[in-house]
Amino acid sequence: MSKRTFQPSNLSRKRTHGFRARMATKNGRQVLSRRRAKGRYRLTV
């Protein structure tokens, strides 16, 4: 049996997928602009 790999933590979640993490890099800003263009209700977690 393999262990459950999802060990939830809000801090690591925000740090890797949060809005400021997206804004920090050029590619992250591209992600946000794509999600805005698509009309996503939530841009980030």
UniProtKB/Swiss-Prot annotation:
Instruction: Please state what the protein is called.
Output: Large ribosomal subunit protein bL34
Where does the record locate the signal sequence feature? none
Q: Where is the composition biased (Basic residues)?
A: 32-45
Supply the source organism for this entry: Dichelobacter nodosus (strain VCS1703A)
Q: Where is this region: Disordered?
A: 1-45
The record's annotation in Pfam families points to:
Ribosomal_L34
User: Member of which family?
Assistant: Belongs to the bacterial ribosomal protein bL34 family.
**What are the protein's GO molecular function terms?**
structural constituent of ribosome
Q: Known InterPro entries for this protein?
A: Ribosomal_bL34, Ribosomal_bL34_CS
Entry keyword set: Ribonucleoprotein, Ribosomal protein
Q: Which GO terms describe its cellular component?
A: ribonucleoprotein complex; ribosome
Start-end of Polar residues biased regions: 1-11
What biological-process GO terms show up in the record? translation
Q: Upper lineage ranks?
A: Bacteria, Pseudomonadati, Pseudomonadota, Gammaproteobacteria, Cardiobacteriales
